Amino acid sequence: SCTAGRSSFITGQSVLRTGLSKVGIPGAPVGMSDKIITIAALLKEQGYATGQFGKNHLGDLNHMLPTNHGFDEFFGNLYHLNAEEEPEMENYPLNEPDMPHFKERFGPRGVIHSFATDVDDATEMPRWGKVGKQKIEDTGPLTAKRMETCDDEFVERASKFIKQAEADGKPWFVWVNTTHMHMFTHPKPGSKGQAGRWQSDYHDTMIDHDKNLSLIHIS
């Protein structure tokens, strides 16, 4: 699981200390503890604008979201891609009479856009828990079709965040985790074949991935 590397990077702690080697199924109580301090939280105390964009994979309950752990803004997905594609798979139990409301009970959250706030919202969201000091919007599921372009969304939002911080004269810390090159790889239709003859969807998407990284560098 990529959770181990992500957690070590953002917390500066070993997986043996945090227990964040992997997370469970959607809605599982496994993920970022409220007691864990991130580099984002420390930098925010020093006046930094802090943003996280793209894949998180450190737990999907509200108290585990990046905007509850030092980030001013988060826009991204919370799982490995195959988990988010499962509801579109042929054998997913959407309408099984012996498994009613399966997706509502066990399915993944969509792409989340959240902001840290000073107001403690006591609202309890079914499955995901108390909102807390953040504003949370589910922008819709990360479908196989959206996977073609979701990194473009994340990079665009990250670039806007950086430019706004610069305009405000604030130092910034931005953590960008694209979904590419994770399984499964869904290239944009216009990108197919761009890597040349005998190449694959993976190679075609890698070119788009490199382009997105360059957009962040020039922000």
Language-model-derived ranges and their functions:
Residues S1-S219:
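Formylglycine-dependent sulfatase
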